[in-house]
UniProtKB/Swiss-Prot annotation:
Source species: Agrobacterium fabrum (strain C58 / ATCC 33970) (Agrobacterium tumefaciens (strain C58))
GO CC term (a single one): cytosol
Protein name as catalogued: DNA polymerase IV 2
Boundaries of every UmuC domain copy: 4-184
Gene: dinB2
Active site as annotated: 103
Organism taxonomic ancestry: Bacteria, Pseudomonadati, Pseudomonadota, Alphaproteobacteria, Hyphomicrobiales
Record site feature (Substrate discrimination), residues: 13
Quaternary structure annotation from Swiss-Prot or TrEMBL: Monomer.
Length: 357
């Protein structure tokens, strides 16, 4: 039986800001821009009590919480803290699969400490994180990745929960499918149209039905409905793509305004790449219009991109190719694909460096 831990930092960006600035402690904080077209990147738990959430337009957030304090993001600091946390994980296991700067899967079945009880390992890791970074973490412990992820949400903030093989299937059956990890809003809505509201409803559907209506994801849904998830914790896992998108509160017609909206998307994409230690060669821009039609444009370079500015420059050039817009723009997206890990990127760059010398 595997022992999987999912560690998730509590309100990570906002908590770092409250840690570093005592005046922010106990107050509603949003990491992001207060500008009219700004977006909340993260919200403290004090802000969440007013309904403030990440990805929410700043105007909406300020309306819900008039005393909300906006703090500009410091991604270099968040990355440094994330590396401290990653080092703590490495004291316990080599099987670490980071999902972002603030969460990761750990397989502690065979761990470096020789500890047998996964809940004790999770508790010790959380204590170490608190001692070294001053931040709180929550954790979920189970026998597979899906249930560990679900468990980490049960006792947030600053808590942990375990889902055992005995209670796993029953837990899944009562869970609303919209809360399933891997089921986004569009998929949940599609499931609802088929009368699938809970895990029990999902379990009642055959593998053939799920494959027919949900494609490759059908087999995954069939398994997790039964508490089964065979995915391994993979330290070397490379995602096929990393993307970010934003739906605007007011549609855009102006190219300069639209181009300005690309920067936060490029920043988000690159910071996810840094967390995964990957880069990519193909930049894609998605433009969704007010009538819900969309256009995509891509550009592939010989070498992986190296930083926010390179993503932004490519995305801006691609966006310009669909201007004048045929309708006003309601959503923009930026995706980086053809991903490689850092070592592969260095190997590709080395021949050019040799030639230059």
């Amino acid at each position: 039986m595997r022992k999987i831990i999912h560690v998730d930092m509590d309100a990570f960006y906002a908590s770092v800001e409250q840690r570093d600035n005592p005046e922010l402690r106990g107050r509603p904080v949003a990491v992001g821009s207060a500008a009219a077209r700004g977006v909340v990147a993260a919200a403290s738990y004090e802000a969440r009590e007013f309904g403030v959430r990440s990805a929410m337009p700043s105007v909406t957030a300020a309306r819900r919480c008039p005393d909300l304090i906006f703090v500009p993001p410091r991604f270099d600091v968040y990355k440094a803290v994330s590396q401290q946390i990653r080092a703590i994980f490495a004291e316990y296991t080599r099987l670490i699969e980071p999902l972002s700067l603030d969460e990761a899967y750990l397989d502690v079945t065979e761990n470096l400490k020789g500890m047998e009880i996964a809940t004790e390992i999770a508790s010790e890791i959380r204590e170490r994180i608190k001692q070294i970074t001053g931040l709180n973490a929550s954790a979920g412990i189970s026998y597979n990745k899906f249930l560990a992820k679900m468990a980490s949400d049960l006792n947030k903030p600053n808590g942990q929960a375990v889902i055992t093989p005995k209670n796993g299937p029953a837990f899944v059956e009562q869970l609303a499918v919209k809360k399933f990890h891997g089921v986004g809003p569009a998929t949940a809505e599609k499931m609802h149209r088929f009368g699938i509201e809970t895990g029990a409803d999902l379990k009642s559907k055959s593998l053939q039905f799920l494959a027919e209506h949900f494609g490759k994801s059908g087999a995954y849904f069939y398994g997790i409905a039964r508490g089964i998830d065979e995915r391994q914790v993979r330290p070397d896992r490379i995602r096929k793509s990393v993307g970010a998108e934003d739906t605007f509160s007011v549609d855009i017609n102006d190219l300069d305004l639209a181009t300005a909206e690309l920067r936060p998307l490029a920043e988000k994409v690159w910071h996810h790449c840094e967390a995964q230690r990957v880069s990519g060669k193909t930049v894609t821009v998605k433009v969704k219009y007010s009538d819900f039609t969309q256009a995509t444009r891509s550009r592939t370079s010989a070498l992986p991109v190296n930083g926010i500015q390179e993503i932004l420059e490519a995305a801006s050039a691609l966006l310009a190719t669909v201007y004048p817009f045929r309708r006003s723009v309601r959503l923009l997206g930026v995706t980086l694909s053809s991903l490689t890990n850092d070592q592969e990127a260095e190997d590709e760059e080395q021949p050019q460096l040799d030639l230059a010398l």
